[in-house]
Amino acid sequence: HFTLLRAHLQSLPGEHDYGSLVAHDGLWQMAERTAHDVTARMALVPRTLEARGLDATPPIQAKLRQLGHPAALKAVDILDVIVRDEVGHVAIGNHWYGWLCQQQQLDPLAHYRELARRYRAPRLRPPFNWVAREQAGFVPAELQALQSEASG
């Protein structure tokens, strides 16, 4: 992903490269906060932050398509590759989070809520990419909980 995005940035007019634009480091901060707890890491990095990328990508792509500029349309294509790969990353996180909860005899839904609170995970807001989340292994109960929490 880095290589695709960096090459695209470098192809744009002006001097653009990795690091020349402002970006957040929320994923890295969460990785540091959960470094001592693999269950928390699986719950909050792939299942929360990377999954949020699944949600955010379609609206970003829609805005880029509206621009109609070749560079914007190239970015849409790059985001297609990234979101497809991210479904796999989130699926791996879902698998291992479920396995870890089973090994520790934890209820995955209840434990997720506790971990999100304890580690100050960002509150997830719509829109949600339900199809990508299902492809990534989120079960109906998790999707219903996500919808309920976002609504209330």
Give a label for each model feature.
Residues 1-152:
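Non-heme di-metal
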